[in-house]
């Protein structure tokens, strides 16, 4: 009886020691959720390592940590993203689509749309109240459809897919399937749902949409500062300016007011 108890006790000690050494010396588990800033002009993807508390912004093959939110549609089956699309704009700017974030989930009347589309080198048309990109199809497959109509969600999805592949390669995992994505505070339910739809097209499940001012406040640890109760967040992006007033209560952020300009020119 005594020997059995001794054996069991020794086994427990061995298991505990093995767990300790494994936790101390084995590499930490790979992050399963990425954070994405899907910007108007630039986007980036990052991961949080729970063991160390470290946040890493994932670079591309050339070490760049931001990706232009641009897609060049060479044909129905071939698209370029980011810096490759930016280079292609010198060749054919009418095929290089951008500013999808301005249009995603947004509805226009004809007058407002006609004023907006004049700002761009590519073609767009109004499908009822939704802005749609319009690109000639390079007919490499003799497709009867000579024109390509591309929704803003599809362009955002292409950028998200590019970021997803960057994360998979950097983390050396087969699949990244979950993400937290930041969106402007002024995005209503329709525009938020359109962003979720774009993520789904890229094969990403959105665990949460977080407002960009809240994301900035969290990044600076303002929720952990006892002497901070209110804060103004200025978000000066590549083509937009947003200002938000946040209240901090019990570690939570409450948006009290928002203002901004979606087109800086």
What are these regions (language model features)?
Residues 2-115, 123-126, 141-145, 149, ...:
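Oxyanion-binding/catalytic loops of NTP- or PPi-dependent enzymes
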Residues 119:
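Conserved thiamine diphosphate
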Residues 136-138:
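Short loop/turn segments at strand-loop or loop-helix junctions that form parts
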């Amino acid at each position: 009886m005594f020997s059995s108890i001794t054996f069991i006790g020794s086994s427990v000690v061995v298991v505990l020691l093995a767990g300790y050494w494994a936790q101390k010396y084995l590499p930490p588990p790979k992050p399963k959720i990425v954070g994405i800033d899907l910007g108007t002009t630039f986007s980036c993807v990052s991961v949080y390592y729970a063991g160390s508390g470290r946040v890493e912004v994932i670079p591309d093959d050339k070490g760049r940590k931001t990706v232009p939110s641009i897609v060049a549609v060479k044909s129905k089956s071939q698209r370029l993203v980011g810096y490759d699309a930016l280079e292609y704009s010198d060749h054919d700017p009418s095929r290089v689509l951008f500013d999808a974030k301005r249009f995603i989930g947004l509805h226009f009347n004809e007058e407002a749309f006609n004023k907006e589309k004049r700002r761009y080198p590519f073609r767009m048309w109004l499908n009822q109240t939704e802005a749609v990109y319009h690109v000639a199809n390079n007919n490499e497959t003799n497709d009867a459809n000579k024109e390509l109509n591309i929704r803003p969600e599809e362009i955002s999805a292409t950028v998200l897919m590019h970021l997803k592949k960057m994360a998979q390669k950097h983390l050396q995992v087969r699949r990244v399937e979950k993400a937290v994505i930041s969106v402007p505070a002024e995005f209503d339910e329709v525009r938020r749902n359109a962003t979720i739809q774009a993520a789904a097209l890229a094969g990403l499940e959105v665990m949460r949409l977080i407002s960009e001012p809240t994301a900035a406040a969290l990044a600076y640890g303002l929720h952990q500062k006892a002497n901070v109760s209110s804060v103004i967040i200025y978000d000066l992006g590549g083509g937009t300016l947003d200002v938000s007033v946040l209240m901090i209560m019990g570690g939570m952020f409450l948006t009290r007011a928002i203002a901004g300009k979606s087109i800086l020119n």
